[in-house]
Amino acid sequence: MSWRRVILLSSLLALVLLCMLQEGTSASVGSRQAAAEGVQEGVKQKIFMQESDASNFLKRRGKRSPKSRDEVNAENRQRLRDDELRREYYEEQRNEFENFVEEQRDEQEERTREAVEQWRQWHYDGLYPSYLYNRQNI
């Protein structure tokens, strides 16, 4: 029971000290800080628009009303960007597939050449010169 009282009393004391320190720092704001806050308010007003302007900006236009030029340009830029990304993706896929097919074709040609060469060596009877020396077109 005494530990609970000690913990409760120390947390209450810490809370009171924090409140007093916060009030002390807020009361000691100098003229420089006040001027800086005034400048910051001016900057905020330049950055942020009025609430009425913001609500008008965010209102959706009617379905039948024509799109503004900015909307059309933004949609066209987005569409062109999507087309370019799609084109790059399919080009990359096509290149990978062409490389794969070329490797498969090379492997198949190598296997076929080896099989034909083995067949010729097995069936060579010694009466004729070997195939390599008997080619018509070199």
Curated annotation (Swiss-Prot):
Give the function comment from the record: May be involved in the negative control of osteogenic differentiation of osteochondrogenic precursor cells in peripheral zones of fetal cartilage and at the cartilage-bone interface.
InterPro entries noted in UniProt = UCMA
Q: Which GO terms describe its molecular function?
A: BMP binding
Q: Where is the composition biased (Basic and acidic residues)?
A: 67-78
Region entry Disordered: which residue ranges? 58-78
Q: How is it modified after translation?
A: Proteolytically cleaved by a furin-like convertase to generate a persistent C-terminal fragment found in almost the entire cartilage matrix, and affecting osteoblast differentiation.
Might you report a single GO cellular component term? Golgi apparatus
Point out the coiled-coil segments of this chain.
78-122
Pro-sequence residue ranges:
28-64
Q: Name one Pfam family in it.
A: UCMA
Q: Which UniProt keywords apply?
A: Coiled coil, Cytoplasm, Cytoskeleton, Extracellular matrix, Golgi apparatus, Secreted, Signal, Sulfation
Query: Which named protein is this?
Result: Unique cartilage matrix-associated protein
Q: Does the keyword Signal apply?
A: yes
Q: Where in the cell is it found?
A: Secreted, Extracellular space, Extracellular matrix
Q: In which tissues is it expressed?
A: Predominantly expressed in resting chondrocytes.
Q: What induces it?
A: Expression inhibited by TGFB1, and weakly inhibited by BMP2.
Residue span of the signal peptide, if any?
1-27
